[in-house]
C-alpha cells in the first residue's frame, strides 16, 4: 500500500540493458525479430523471478520488498514491450491527438503488491475515440505478455468510459482508485485521474464506505465467518490481506491518502497502530509469496499441507511445547487478530469524522443526541464507552467491568474504548488478577444471561482476557494441527461458552433435549460455565491437557470465587471432559460392563449432568458438522443408561427381563406381522435382543422371513434411518468367515463410511449384520440410486467379483490433506472393558480401505468380530472391535495378542497403502 523502495533493482532486471538488447534485435532482424525478442524478454523474466525467489529465501518475512520487487519486474517488462511495439512494430511519425496511450497498473499490480503468480491487471487508456493504431499497440502488447506466461486482466477505455463505468460499478471504481501510471502518455493519465476524483469520488464517500463494508461482510461469510479457521485464506479470509486493503481503499477514497502511512495524518490510526498495520501486512504478503512459490500457482489457501512447508521456509523452530508449524500458525492468527482490532479502530474513527461533519453541516447542526450514564460509563447509540482517556488507568478493574456491563445490558463496546482497553491491558498485573471485585465481575460476565460469547470475544480481541487469565492467554491464537478441530483453542473455547448459553436459554432444545432439561437441575450453573472455559486451557503444554488442565482449574477456581465443592467438580470435569464422548463412540453401549465402568468413574447424578452438558458444547464448538444426530443418539443412550444406574443403584432390569421387555416392544412394532416373532424369535440369541433397538429388530425379522420364504441365500436391504442420521444397511447371509471384512469393503467401494456395526449369528447359522453408514461428509444416503449402489457393491464383494483390496486402495482419500499429518498406527487390547469380549482399539490414519483391511487381518488371525464402532477425528480414525476367538472366548494369550497386534499395525500402515496404490 506504500510503494517501498526496491533495493538492488538491476539485479532483478536492468531495463536499459534489456531495452538495448531488444533494440539491437529489432534493428538486425526487422519484422522477423519477434521470436528472438520474446526469448530475451523471457530470459529477463526468469532471471528476475529467480532473484526474487532467492531474496524470499534469504529474507523470508520481507513481504513488502518481495511483492514490490515483482511489480517492479513487470513494470520494466511492460515499458520495454511498449517502447518496442510503438517504435518498431507500429511506429507513427506524426501522431494525432487521438493516437495516444497510457498504460496503467491496477489491482494488486497497481498497489505494487504482486506475489510470484499474481495476475497482471492492466488498463490501457486512450483519448476520446479508439484509433486503429491504439488497437494495434494494445493487441501487440497483450500478445507479448500472454506469450511470457502472464495471466493478464485487461481493459481498454477512454476517460469518458472510465468515469461512466466507475460510477456504475464498485469493482471498477476500486480498481481505478489504486491505478498507477506505468508508461506512455502521462498527460492522458493525469487528465483521467483528475476527472476520477472530481466526477466519480466527490459526494459518494459514504456510499463507497457502506458498499465496501457490505462487500467485506459478504466475503467474511463465504470464508467461514471467523478469522480463526485453521485453514485460512490469506487473501480473502477474515483478518487477511483484503481486509487491510479495504481500510486503505476507504482511507484513500475519503482522505486521498497515497499510502498507508497517510492514514496516521488523517487521524484514523496512531503511529503504533500503523506499525502494527505494516507488520501484519508484511507478514501476510510474505506468507502469500511462499504459497505461490511452493505451489507454482496463485494459491491463497493456507491448507495443512502447506503450513509445515511455510513454517520451515519462514524459519519457525520447534520448541519443547509447540511444533514449528503450531508456532507459525499462532503468529499468523495473532497478526489477523491485530488486523481485526485495527479495522474496528479505523471504522470508529471514520464514523466519528462523518458524525462531526454531519453535526456541522446537517439539518441537526447544534443538536446533541442524548446519552446516559451507567455506573460512570457513557451509553450512547447502543454503545458503552469509557468517559475519559484515563478511565482504565485510574482503576484497571474497569477493564473487566466494561465488558461485563456490555453483556448484562445488551450493549456494544464503543470502538474507541476498545482501543483504550487494548492500550491499557498492560495495566493488568497480579494485583488486579487477585482482586476479589475483579474476579466477581469476571465470573458475572462468564455466566452472563444475555450473550457472554460475544462479550468474551470482544474482551479477547482487546487483549484483556489473556492478561486477566494468563492461562487463557497461552492458548490465544493457538491452532491445533489436525483436521478435526476447525478453530484455534481460544475461539473453540469461546464458542463452547456460547453454545452453553444457548442451551441454557432453550435455543438448542431440538438438538440437545437432555442438556436443555438437565442444565436447569444442576446445583451450580457457575460450574458449567467455568468448566467450559477451562476444559482445554492446558493445550499446547506438551503433556496430557486434561490432567494439566485439572491442575489449572484447582488454582483458578478459588480465585474466581468458587467454593471447595465447585472447585472439585470443575477440576473433575476438566480431567474427564473426554470420557463421555470416548465411551459413547468407542464402546458397545449394550454391554453392561461399559455402563458399569462409566458409572464407576462418574459416581453422581450431578457429575453426570455436568459432563453431558460439557460434552455436548465441546463437540458442537469443534466446528460445523461435528455434531450430528448419530452422536446425539449415542450420548443420549449412554446418559439414559448411566442415569438409571446412578438413580436406582443398579440396572432397572436384569438380562432376562430386558430380553422379555424387548420382545414385547418388538411384538407391538410388528403389528399385524407379530406372528413372525413366534416363528423366528427363538433363533435369535439374547445378545442380539440386548444389542439392537426394537425398530431395527422388527425390520430384521421381516427381512429374514422374506429371505427364507424365497430361499434367498443373500439378502441386502438399505434404508434411511432419520433418528440416527445415517443409513441402516442390513445383510442377511449364510454365516462364514470373512463376511465382515467383505461387507465393509463393499460399503466403502460404494462411497460409504461405516460408523457402527453389529454382527450377529442366529442359532441356525445365519448372519444378521447391521451397519450404520454415512457419506464422506457425515450425511446419510437417502436416494434410491445411492442405496441400490451400496446393495450391489456389497453383493459383488461377498461374491468375490473382482479384487477388493486393490480397488479400495485406488479410491482417493476423502480428505487428501491427511498426508500432511504424521499419524502412527497404534493397537490397544483391553480384556477388562467387557465381561464377554476382548476389546481391540486401533488408531490409525483414516482412509477408505482401513476398516476392510483391519477386518481382513482379524479374519486371517481367526478372530471373530461381534461388533465394531468407528469414529473419525479428521485425519485420524479410531476403530474399536469387540471380538472373541473361534470358540467364543476372550483372547488372553500374550503371544497371540502380539501376533494380532502386528497384523493390525501392518494393515493400517502407510507402507501397506503404498504397496497397494498403483505406481
UniProtKB/Swiss-Prot annotation:
Reaction catalysed by this chain? Answer: [protein-PII]-L-tyrosine + UTP = [protein-PII]-uridylyl-L-tyrosine + diphosphate; [protein-PII]-uridylyl-L-tyrosine + H2O = [protein-PII]-L-tyrosine + UMP + H(+)
Cofactor(s) the protein needs: Mg(2+)
**Protein keywords:** Hydrolase, Magnesium, Multifunctional enzyme, Nucleotidyltransferase, Repeat, Transferase
Name its GO BP terms in alphabetical order: regulation of nitrogen utilization
Instruction: Report the coiled-coil segments.
Output: none
Pfam families the UniProt entry points to: DUF294, GlnD_UR_UTase, HD
Enzyme Commission identifier(s):
2.7.7.59, 3.1.4.-
The UniProt entry, under Gene3D superfamilies, shows: 3.30.70.260, Beta Polymerase, domain 2 (3.30.460.10), cca-adding enzyme, domain 2 (1.10.3090.10)
User: Is NAD set as a keyword in this record?
Assistant: no
Q: How activity is regulated?
A: Uridylyltransferase (UTase) activity is inhibited by glutamine, while glutamine activates uridylyl-removing (UR) activity.
Domain of life of the organism in this record?
A: Bacteria
Annotated region described as Uridylyl-removing, given as residue ranges = 374-727
- The HD domain, residue ranges: 489-611
Q: Which NCBIfam families did the record assign? A: PRK05092.1, UTase_glnD
Q: What does this protein do?
A: Modifies, by uridylylation and deuridylylation, the PII regulatory proteins (GlnB and homologs), in response to the nitrogen status of the cell that GlnD senses through the glutamine level. Under low glutamine levels, catalyzes the conversion of the PII proteins and UTP to PII-UMP and PPi, while under higher glutamine levels, GlnD hydrolyzes PII-UMP to PII and UMP (deuridylylation). Thus, controls uridylylation state and activity of the PII proteins, and plays an important role in the regulation of nitrogen assimilation and metabolism.
Which PANTHER family does the record cross-reference, listed alphabetically? BIFUNCTIONAL URIDYLYLTRANSFERASE/URIDYLYL-REMOVING ENZYME (PTHR47320), BIFUNCTIONAL URIDYLYLTRANSFERASE_URIDYLYL-REMOVING ENZYME (PTHR47320:SF1)
- What is recorded about the domains? Has four distinct domains: an N-terminal nucleotidyltransferase (NT) domain responsible for UTase activity, a central HD domain that encodes UR activity, and two C-terminal ACT domains that seem to have a role in glutamine sensing.
Q: Which family does it belong to?
A: Belongs to the GlnD family.
Q: What is this protein called?
A: Bifunctional uridylyltransferase/uridylyl-removing enzyme
Organism expressing this protein natively: Erythrobacter litoralis (strain HTCC2594)
Gene expressing this chain: glnD
Amino acid at each position: 500500500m506504500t510503494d517501498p523502495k526496491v533495493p538492488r533493482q538491476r539485479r532483478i532486471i536492468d531495463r536499459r540493458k534489456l531495452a538495448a538488447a531488444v533494440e539491437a534485435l529489432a534493428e538486425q532482424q526487422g519484422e522477423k525479430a519477434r521470436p528472438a525478442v520474446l526469448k530475451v524478454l523471457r530470459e529477463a523474466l526468469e532471471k528476475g523471478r529467480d532473484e526474487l525467489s532467492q531474496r524470499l529465501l534469504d529474507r523470508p518475512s520481507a513481504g513488502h520488498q518481495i511483492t514490490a520487487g515483482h511489480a517492479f519486474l513487470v513494470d520494466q517488462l511492460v515499458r520495454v514491450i511498449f517502447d518496442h511495439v510503438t517504435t518498431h512494430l507500429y511506429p507513427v511519425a506524426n501522431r494525432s491527438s487521438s493516437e495516444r496511450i497510457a498504460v496503467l497498473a491496477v489491482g494488486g499490480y497497481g498497489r505494487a503488491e504482486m506475489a510470484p503468480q499474481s495476475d497482471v491487471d492492466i488498463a490501457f487508456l486512450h483519448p476520446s475515440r479508439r484509433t486503429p493504431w491504439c488497437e494495434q499497440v494494445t493487441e501487440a502488447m497483450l500478445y507479448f505478455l500472454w506469450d511470457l506466461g502472464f495471466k493478464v486482466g485487461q481493459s481498454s477505455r477512454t476517460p469518458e468510459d472510465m468515469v461512466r463505468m466507475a460510477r456504475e460499478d464498485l469493482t471498477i471504481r476500486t480498481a481505478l482508485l489504486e491505478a498507477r501510471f506505468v508508461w506512455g502518455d502521462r498527460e492522458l493519465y493525469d487528465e483521467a485521474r483528475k476527472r476520477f476524483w472530481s466526477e466519480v469520488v466527490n459526494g459518494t464517500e459514504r456510499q463507497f464506505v457502506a458498499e465496501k463494508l457490505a462487500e467485506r461482510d459478504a466475503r467474511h461469510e463465504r470464508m467461514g465467518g471467523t478469522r480463526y479457521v485453521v485453514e485460512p485464506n490469506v487473501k480473502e479470509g477474515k483478518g487477511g490481506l483484503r481486509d487491510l486493503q479495504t481500510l486503505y481503499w476507504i482511507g484513500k477514497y475519503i482522505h486521498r491518502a497515497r499510502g498507508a502511512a497517510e492514514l496516521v495524518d488523517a487521524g484514523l490510526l496512531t503511529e503504533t497502530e500503523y506499525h502494527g498495520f505494516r507488520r501484519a501486512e508484511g507478514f501476510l504478503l510474505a506468507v502469500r509469496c511462499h504459497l505461490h512459490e511452493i505451489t507454482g500457482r496463485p494459491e491463497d489457501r493456507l491448507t495443512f499441507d502447506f503450513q509445515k512447508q511455510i513454517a520451515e521456509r519462514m524459519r519457525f523452530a520447534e520448541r519443547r511445547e509447540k511444533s514449528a508449524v503450531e508456532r507459525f500458525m499462532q503468529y499468523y492468527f495473532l497478526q489477523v487478530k491485530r488486523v481485526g482490532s485495527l479495522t474496528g479502530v479505523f471504522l470508529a474513527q471514520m464514523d466519528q469524522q462523518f458524525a462531526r461533519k454531519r453535526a456541522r453541516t446537517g439539518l441537526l447542526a447544534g443538536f446533541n443526541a442524548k446519552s446516559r450514564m451507567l455506573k460512570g460509563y457513557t451509553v450512547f447509540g447502543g454503545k458503552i464507552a469509557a468517559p475519559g482517556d484515563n478511565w482504565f488507568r485510574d482503576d484497571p478493574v474497569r477493564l473487566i467491568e466494561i465488558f461485563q456491563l456490555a453483556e448484562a445490558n445488551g450493549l456494544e463496546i464503543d470502538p474507541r474504548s476498545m482501543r483504550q482497553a487494548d492500550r491499557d491491558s498492560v495495566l493488568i498485573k497480579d494485583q488486579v488478577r487477585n482482586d476479589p471485585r475483579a474476579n466477581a465481575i469476571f465470573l458475572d460476565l462468564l455466566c452472563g444471561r444475555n450473550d457472554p460469547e460475544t462479550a468474551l470475544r470482544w474482551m479477547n480481541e482487546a487483549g484483556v482476557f489473556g492478561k486477566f487469565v494468563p492461562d487463557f492467554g497461552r492458548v490465544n491464537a493457538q491452532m491445533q494441527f489436525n483436521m478435526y478441530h476447525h478453530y484455534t483453542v481460544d475461539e473453540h473455547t469461546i464458542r463452547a461458552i456460547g453454545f452453553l448459553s444457548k442451551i441454557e436459554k432453550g435455543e438448542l432444545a431440538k438438538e440437545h433435549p437432555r442438556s436443555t432439561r438437565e442444565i436447569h437441575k444442576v446445583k451450580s450453573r457457575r460450574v458449567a460455565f467455568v468448566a467450559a472455559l477451562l476444559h482445554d486451557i492446558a493445550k499446547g503444554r506438551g503433556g496430557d491437557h486434561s490432567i494439566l488442565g485439572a491442575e489449572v482449574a484447582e488454582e483458578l477456581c478459588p480465585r474466581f470465587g468458587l467454593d471447595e465443592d465447585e472447585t472439585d467438580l470443575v477440576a473433575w470435569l476438566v480431567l474427564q471432559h473426554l470420557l463421555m464422548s470416548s465411551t459413547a463412540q468407542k464402546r458397545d453401549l449394550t454391554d453392561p460392563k461399559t455402563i458399569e465402568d462409566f458409572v464407576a468413574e462418574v459416581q453422581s447424578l450431578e457429575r453426570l449432568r455436568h459432563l453431558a452438558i460439557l460434552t455436548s458444547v465441546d463437540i458442537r464448538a469443534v466446528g460445523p458438522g461435528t455434531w450430528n444426530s448419530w452422536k446425539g443418539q449415542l450420548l443420549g443412550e449412554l446418559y439414559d443408561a448411566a442415569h438409571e444406574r446412578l438413580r436406582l443403584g443398579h440396572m432397572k432390569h436384569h438380562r432376562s427381563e430386558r430380553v422379555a421387555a424387548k420382545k414385547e416392544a418388538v411384538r407391538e412394532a410388528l403389528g399385524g406381522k407379530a406372528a413372525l416373532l413366534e416363528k423366528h424369535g427363538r433363533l435369535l440369541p439374547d445378545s442380539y435382543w440386548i444389542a439392537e433397538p426394537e425398530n431395527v429388530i422388527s425390520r430384521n425379522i421381516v427381512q429374514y422371513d422374506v429371505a427364507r420364504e424365497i430361499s434367498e441365500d443373500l439378502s441386502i436391504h438399505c434404508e434411511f434411518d432419520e433418528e440416527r442420521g445415517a443409513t441402516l444397511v442390513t445383510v442377511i447371509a449364510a454365516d462364514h468367515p470373512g463376511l465382515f471384512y467383505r461387507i465393509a469393503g463393499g460399503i466403502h467401494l460404494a462411497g460409504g463410511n461405516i460408523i457402527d456395526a453389529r454382527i450377529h449369528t442366529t442359532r441356525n447359522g445365519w448372519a444378521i449384520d447391521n451397519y450404520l453408514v454415512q457419506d464422506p461428509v457425515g450425511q446419510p444416503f437417502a436416494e434410491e440410486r445411492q442405496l441400490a449402489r451400496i446393495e450391489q457393491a456389497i453383493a459383488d464383494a461377498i461374491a468375490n467379483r473382482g479384487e477388493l483390496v486393490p480397488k479400495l486402495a485406488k479410491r482417493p482419500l476423502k480428505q487428501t490433506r491427511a498426508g500432511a499429518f504424521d499419524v502412527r498406527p497404534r493397537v490397544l487390547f483391553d480384556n477388562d472393558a467387557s465381561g464377554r469380549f476382548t476389546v481391540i482399539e486401533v488408531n490409525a490414519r483414516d482412509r477408505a480401505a482401513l476398516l476392510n483391511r483391519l477386518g481382513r487381518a482379524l479374519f486371517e488371525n481367526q478372530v471373530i468380530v461381534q461388533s465394531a464402532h468407528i469414529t473419525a477425528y479428521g485425519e485420524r480414525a479410531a476403530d474399536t472391535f469387540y471380538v472373541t476367538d473361534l470358540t467364543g472366548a476372550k483372547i488372553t494369550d500374550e503371544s497371540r495378542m502380539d501376533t494380532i497386534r502386528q497384523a493390525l499395525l501392518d494393515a493400517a500402515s502407510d507402507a501397506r497403502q503404498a504397496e497397494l496404490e498403483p505406481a
